[in-house]
Amino acid sequence: MAKHERGLRFQPAGGVKTVQIPAGKKQRLTIERLSDDGRGIAFLEGKTWFVAGSLAGEEVEARVLNARGKVVEARTERVFTASAMRRAPACEYFGRCGGCSVQHVPHEEQLALKQRMLAEQLLRVANVVPDEWAAPLSGAELAYRRRARVAVRWDAKAKRLDVGFRAAASQDIVSIEHCPVLVQALQPIMNELPGMLKSFSKPQVLGHVELFSGVATAVLLRHTASLVEADLALLQAFCSRHGAQLWLHGEGEPQPASPGDTLGYRLEPWNLQLAWRPGDFIQVNASVNTAMIEQALQWLAPAKDERVMDLFCGLGNFALPLAGLARDVVAVEGVATMVERAAVNAMSNDLHNVRFFQADLSQPLTQADWAAEGFSAVLLDPPRDGAFEVVRQIRKTGARRLLYVSCNPATLARDAVELIRQGYRLKRAGILDMFPQTAHVEAMALFEMSK
């Protein structure tokens, strides 16, 4: 009996344990197709590989970044057989920096990928196709980003200051001295920033840096302890040379080094200027933001005698232009400080037919007085989680038209199911190319109450 027992193989409950592939391992793969996020998909020995930097039909060597169960995440290290679609990336850091994921894909193909992602989500989740597909709303491929956070970390062991952007799927910092997606006003600042910070006498106190471009250019430094005078003088001279405001973020809220300095951006078609502060949300792509507002107003088409509700209104990015067309605008935002700034923005732009309210829009709206007033149209611009609680009650507002601006096609499709159940019809939809060179999809959808 014992002789036979030695030949038996016992396995724990749950089946055979999957052998994990170690990070760093290189593997030759044939890419079958692209995933929704722009990565190549390959299949090998029962595992599905998601390979950044690859294209359908290519044969590549991929380095494993992470493996879990039957899913392997990897990065292209070498291309043996290239797709005819492949192009040279505009940035030398592409493939290492985590900021851009599809620079190797022509822009028209990037737009087609995003359009397909939106269409597939709407069809699969909501079983709906819009009555009309709008052309993609896009702008410049490069030099579009007016805001960026630069990672800074002191390596005490190596006595080295790392300055750059986070690596893909990692907390590592890729040292970077230029970034082609930044607007031109920020390019020379980014070029010289690493060298300037590395000359600090006390680099240990440095946190991240934020760069802003708008009505004014600004540099914000997060620091964990007080700056010594020599380092502060170095920073002030750097900002002065680049014509930039300096903001410091130690304890408490960020503050300008020169009292009275403010940040803001223009919406030229409506002769509006919106003030904001570090920490506030603004769209990073100024030209596509303007085009997005123009398209939203065209689609929603508010009349002079209509009341419009703007939910998740932020600083008034949509509400203020809407106020120039509608009789009355009610704008609602969850962050109290942004509600305060939005109200100030309305006053400074001499708009008196828009009112701002603070509310938790993840909760039912039935208790809010402003929700019971009745509206002709509603505009939604929610975060990635979507607006499910809002759309569940949207019919109670009386709105026959609803414009949904989405930064996540999955939650847009989920919310579309509820809107269609309430009797709304998806009249028009299209993508907004807010982040060229990435697979990130923003979208706009117009729903109208069925007659």
Swiss-Prot record:
PANTHER family membership: 23S RRNA (URACIL(1939)-C(5))-METHYLTRANSFERASE RLMD (PTHR11061:SF49), RNA M5U METHYLTRANSFERASE (PTHR11061)
Source species, domain of life: Bacteria
Enzyme type, top EC level: transferase
Catalytic activity: uridine(1939) in 23S rRNA + S-adenosyl-L-methionine = 5-methyluridine(1939) in 23S rRNA + S-adenosyl-L-homocysteine + H(+)
Organism, scientific name: Pseudomonas syringae pv. syringae (strain B728a)
Role, per record: Catalyzes the formation of 5-methyl-uridine at position 1939 (m5U1939) in 23S rRNA.
This protein's name: 23S rRNA (uracil(1939)-C(5))-methyltransferase RlmD
Pfam families linked: TRAM, tRNA_U5-meth_tr
NCBIfam families with a match to the protein in the record: PRK13168.1, rumA
EC assignment: 2.1.1.190
Active-site residues per Swiss-Prot or TrEMBL entry: 407 (nucleophile)
Family, as annotated: Belongs to the class I-like SAM-binding methyltransferase superfamily. RNA M5U methyltransferase family. RlmD subfamily.
Domain TRAM: 20-78
Sites where the protein binds S-adenosyl-L-methionine: 283, 312, 317, 333, 360, 381
Coiled coil regions, renumbered to chain: none
Organism lineage: Bacteria, Pseudomonadati, Pseudomonadota, Gammaproteobacteria, Pseudomonadales
UniProtKB keywords: 4Fe-4S, Iron, Iron-sulfur, Metal-binding, Methyltransferase, rRNA processing, S-adenosyl-L-methionine, Transferase
GO MF term (any one): 4 iron, 4 sulfur cluster binding
Residue sites binding [4Fe-4S] cluster per the record: 91, 97, 100, 179
One biological process term in Gene Ontology: rRNA base methylation
